[in-house]
């Protein structure tokens, strides 16, 4: 199974590829990086993930890239890790919330649903890249 994550300072959005369908999963709320890396490690083990797709911004965001790379090194995972450009994934995910009212949009941001929709976009990009190369 393939899992994607959108690593943020407060939340980690999660999406999975199940039988060819990309689905958002419940986001991991970050209290600190050790707790978040343990939670992600547990999820990867529970779901028997073989490939972890991680969103990274454009290389001009050096601090953010270093933070994401450091966090991923804390994750206990022996499978394949693939980094995919995440530029505009959060904006595209937010556009998917257009049907919600203001209050529900704010809640979707706070509870991590937006982050998991962003992880869906990252996973879509990975799938497009893999299909293009085959």
UniProtKB/Swiss-Prot annotation:
EC number: 3.1.-.-
EC top class, as a word: hydrolase
One term of GO molecular function: nuclease activity
UniProt superkingdom: Bacteria
One GO term describing the cellular component: cytoplasm
Pfam families, alphabetized: RuvX
Subcellular location, record wording: Cytoplasm
The keyword Cytoplasm appears for this protein: yes
Listed InterPro entries: RNaseH-like_sf, YqgF, YqgF/RNaseH-like_dom, YqgF/RNaseH-like_dom_sf
SUPFAM superfamilies found in the cross-reference section: Ribonuclease H-like
SMART domains noted in UniProt: YqgFc
GO biological process: rRNA 5'-end processing
Keywords associated with the record: Cytoplasm, Hydrolase, Nuclease, Ribosome biogenesis
HAMAP family found in the cross-reference section: Nuclease_YqgF
Matching PANTHER family: POLYNUCLEOTIDYL TRANSFERASE, RIBONUCLEASE H-LIKE SUPERFAMILY PROTEIN
Family: Belongs to the YqgF nuclease family.
Function as written in the Swiss-Prot or TrEMBL entry: Could be a nuclease involved in processing of the 5'-end of pre-16S rRNA.
Protein name as annotated: Putative pre-16S rRNA nuclease
